[in-house]
Amino acid sequence: MMQKRNIRALTKEELRTFFESNGDKAFRGNQVYEWLWQKGVHTFEAMTSLPKATREMLAEHFSINHIKVDVMQRSNDGTIKNAVRLHDGLLVESVLIPTDTRTTACVSSQVGCSLNCSFCATARLKRMRNLLPDEIFDQVKVIDEQSRAFFGRPLSNIVFMGMGEPLMNYNNVLKAIDKITSPEGLGMSPKRITLSTSGIPKLIKKMADDEVKFKLAVSLHSAIGSVRTGIMPFNEQFPLEELRDALAYWYQKTKNRITYEYVVWKGINDQKKDVEALIKFCKFAPSKVNLIEYNPIDDGDFQQADPKALELYQTMLEAAGITVTVRHSRGKDIDAACGQLANKKVKSEE
């Protein structure tokens, strides 16, 4: 029996070529592409503008892979966490984060993660595989629908801060963003999309060379090499000096401000010297620092810093002319906060 190919892996041109090679008109490819990405149908039978014979031919050759929300949880603060079942049975998680003025989708790019950051629940999961472009797109599509249903407004922002390191799935993430921003997809502005990376220098430079239009955030957490290596072991492979050079290249090419994600922990990075190192690291380009409240994970050894440590960071950063925000996490009661994804449900199925 012929293995059916996921039709959503084909470009519009490949669809047009398929129809031509099967004795049909190329414009059928345009129609199918619209059904798949704008209208989001799950079956060929639903493509009602196509002749029945064409729909049957498609069903013979292709499948339409779609994600399924296995479990949806709602937090006391309105945050929604989705346990998402992929076509091969694997699970990832995505989150809808509401505020008074906007709704943000936090989406995953990999099943698990291979970077082993010691403070992150996802790092405890073995990386199984990269997500496909349609699987990333579908997470956003589902959360847009949830935003409209629960909050009466379309999705306003997307952050790649879920499970996985987006730059280790570079091509698929960029293909997904292309679909998300295309008028033939969701039509979202790339300026409303932020890709958060732990910092892979050569791929940050590649993004700059590829002239991407979305925003960049770096999961930094310490600007002292030995401290960062202790909490993010891959820093030994991609040291801060190389990361800084890559970010300088990014800014030179894009002129876009760089955002740093930064959790402050008790006894790890809560001293004045830590703030001074961060200021020195940031000064080469316009920067914004998001100070993030730590969210404990099961059996974790990390502790929240004293509020005075956050005040010290905020005061010193602002005095140095660096924009700073203190981000209080949402969805903690359902393990949907930063660093908590995959803390319970996915691990239980390993």
State each model region's role.
Residues 75, 108-109, 196, 219:
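Short linear Ser/Thr-Pro motifs
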Residues 1-91, 98, 248-257, 264-350:
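Auxiliary Fe-S-binding modules of radical SAM enzymes
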Residues 12, 114, 200-202, 224-225, ...:
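Alpha-helix N-cap/helix-start and coil->helix boundary motif
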Residues 98-144:
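Canonical Radical SAM [4Fe-4S] cluster-binding loop centered on the CxxxCxxC motif
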Residues 144-320:
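Conserved AdoMet/S-adenosylmethionine-binding subsite of the radical SAM
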Residues 96-97, 172:
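Residue-level structural signal for beta-strand termini and adjacent loop
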Residues 80, 92, 103-107, 115, ...:
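Generic beta-strand structural signal
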